[in-house]
Amino acid sequence: MSHRPRKRFGQNFLRDPAVIQRMVTAIAPREGETLLEIGPGEGALTEPLLARLGTLTAVELDRDLAPRLQERFAPALRVIEGDALALDPAELAPAQGRLRVVGNLPYNVSTPILFHLLAAADVIEDLHLLLQREVVDRMVAPPGGKTRGRLSVMVQYRCRVERCFNVPAGAFFPAPKVMSSFVRLVPHRPLPARAQDEAWLQEVVTAAFGGRRKTLRNSLKGLVTAQAFEAAGVDPGARAETLSVEAFVRLADAARSAPAAAAGR
């Protein structure tokens, strides 16, 4: 199924059969599971997934591709024409069990889609996503890592993250200017460290990484008091990239009811 890629959708279609087979092996779909594919494109991954699953739901934004996919794979494939950001995963999850999610996400909207899916982690079994390698570098970065940032902390707060393998630009048409990585995310059950207020945790983490060279004392001024740093056991002279997820949770919880936190919200 040939289709001219649209730049405004950030379309890069997967064409390499060897890469597709590696992805299917990593996903290991089993008949009877409920799986959602985001951005099926030309159906390169859809076809082998359907061979394993029998049925599949896909969401496709491109209104030219959506009906062609439906026609090609009917009745086994259900295509939802629209934006993945407008989709509620809870509505697609089975009554018993959870939803599995697979996707080759457009680089220009990959982070918003990722956070949208993480917000529904309670109904998601796992996610297998093809993303820009630079994004995955940040997702898997450990404390002290050069690429550690807000994305690292918030993704690792919610999930166990594993890079499955890297994918060369030549596996796509048109070939992007960057490498890609295939990544597996498995939501924690239960969370190793649960924040009292997850929106507040995200606010603290975002502020902490607002100035890469700043100490936490400076980047969190007005949000976190000296007393909160002490209560959390966090050095205010440290930099954000050195903190673990657990340390951020302790810090956010300690600051949550402090006067400085209330003033900064």
From Swiss-Prot:
Its EC number is 2.1.1.182. The keyword Transferase applies. PROSITE patterns: RRNA_A_DIMETH, SAM_RNA_A_N6_MT. It catalyses: adenosine(1518)/adenosine(1519) in 16S rRNA + 4 S-adenosyl-L-methionine = N(6)-dimethyladenosine(1518)/N(6)-dimethyladenosine(1519) in 16S rRNA + 4 S-adenosyl-L-homocysteine + 4 H(+). It comes from the Bacteria. Signal peptide: none annotated. S-adenosyl-L-methionine binds at N12, L14, G39, E60, D83, N104. Gene3D superfamilies: Ribosomal RNA adenine dimethylase-like, domain 2, Vaccinia Virus protein VP39. GO terms for molecular function: 16S rRNA (adenine(1518)-N(6)/adenine(1519)-N(6))-dimethyltransferase activity; RNA binding. It is found in: Cytoplasm. One of its GO terms (cellular component) is cytosol. Keywords: Cytoplasm, Methyltransferase, RNA-binding, rRNA processing, S-adenosyl-L-methionine, Transferase. Specifically dimethylates two adjacent adenosines (A1518 and A1519) in the loop of a conserved hairpin near the 3'-end of 16S rRNA in the 30S particle. May play a critical role in biogenesis of 30S subunits. Belongs to the class I-like SAM-binding methyltransferase superfamily. rRNA adenine N(6)-methyltransferase family. RsmA subfamily. This is Ribosomal RNA small subunit methyltransferase A. The lineage of its organism: Bacteria, Pseudomonadati, Pseudomonadota, Gammaproteobacteria, Chromatiales.
